[in-house]
């Protein structure tokens, strides 16, 4: 069984996230996808929406499972629950949990190309590569040589870091938060399920977007 993990702050989740996950799934053809919003990211100062609301907004990913050729998809609140209990979130711990709960499964981790360039800063990054294969969604923006050089440095033997080409969508959560704070709806960038939660809760209004 092949399981593809896709994590992030998802503050808010947007169509670029869906596009990246679709590309990663098409690259490795998993039997199951697990979308995991972070409780508290080690790389960010905080999130604008609570873990519970980001988890609710991530239900928008379920639409991918209805597309031809896509596997079942689970939106997991495990990291959000860990953070609520006072635990620090690290990707390697999530992968270890998935490995325990799915003995014999082949694990994949989908990340963006910017994350690969900073991968050595991840907690126990060597163990991440031991436990899972990393699928990098790579946009055609001229950074391919640097990405492949980085992959060779991190994984000299090859086979643990894969690339999934993806059409670049010009959006980032920080930019969307700023536009939402200015009163825009961002209909082209945000699924209706996400916009519905934002409207209901009044999220991102009169707040500055902090980090992507």
Enumerate the predicted regions with their spans.
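Nucleotidyltransferase catalytic core that binds NTPs
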Residues: 1-212
């Amino acid at each position: 069984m092949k399981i593809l993990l896709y994590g992030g702050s998802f503050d808010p989740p947007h169509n670029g996230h869906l596009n990246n996950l679709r590309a990663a799934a098409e690259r490795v053809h998993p039997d199951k996808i697990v979308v995991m919003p972070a409780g508290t990211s080690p790389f960010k100062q905080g999130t604008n929406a609570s873990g519970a609301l980001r988890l609710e907004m991530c239900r928008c990913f379920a639409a991918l499972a209805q597309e031809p050729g896509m596997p079942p998809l689970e939106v997991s609140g495990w990291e959000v629950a860990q953070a609520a209990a006072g635990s620090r979130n690290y990707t390697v711990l999530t992968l270890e949990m998935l490995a325990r709960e799915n003995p014999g499964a082949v694990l994949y981790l989908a990340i963006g190309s910017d994350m690969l360039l900073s991968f050595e800063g991840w907690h126990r990054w060597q163990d991440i590569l031991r436990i899972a294969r990393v699928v990098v969604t790579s946009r055609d923006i001229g950074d391919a040589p640097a990405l492949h050089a980085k992959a060779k440095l991190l994984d000299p033997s090859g086979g643990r870091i894969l690339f999934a080409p993806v059409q670049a969508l010009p959006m980032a959560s920080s930019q969307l938060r700023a536009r939402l704070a200015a009163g825009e709806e961002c209909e082209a960038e945000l699924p209706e399920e996400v916009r519905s939660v934002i409207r209901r809760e009044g999220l991102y209004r009169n707040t500055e977007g902090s980090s992507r």
